[in-house]
Amino acid sequence: MGHIKREGVFIIKDLETLKVVADPVRNQIMEVLEKKPQNVKEVADKLGLAPSKLYYHFNMLEKVGLIQVVETRQVANLIEKYYQASSSFIDIDPTLLNFSTAE
């Protein structure tokens, strides 16, 4: 598991998750989703980006557990997913940043 949650804090425990969170667009997405659940189009409108440019980022964030689907709605013949940030705060496990020097 690449993360643990502690009292509203998402703790990153692996490099894959750290790389995902390091992306500026993904940071913006998480900031928007911290406030309330929204779908990809709503987030895209807030960020001034095309929804098609965000699907990859949403998938990466969901894959590592930084965001989650909290609601689905049927709109005509489409299903809209509403996402929310998993936690309000992110921290990095200090052991992930420990570098040993072998001699």
What does each model-found stretch correspond to?
Residues 3-18:
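Short, Lys/Arg-enriched N-terminal segment that forms or immediately precedes the first helix
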Residues 27-31:
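Pre-recognition alpha-helix immediately N-terminal to the DNA-recognition helix
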Residues 50-52:
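Short coil turns linking two alpha-helices in DNA-binding domains
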Residues 42-48, 61:
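A short acidic, leucine-rich amphipathic alpha-helix
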Residues 19-26:
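Short helix-coil-helix linker/hinge
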Residues 18, 64, 74-103:
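Conserved segment of winged-helix/HTH DNA-binding domains
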Residues 24, 35-42:
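Short capping segments at the starts of secondary-structure elements
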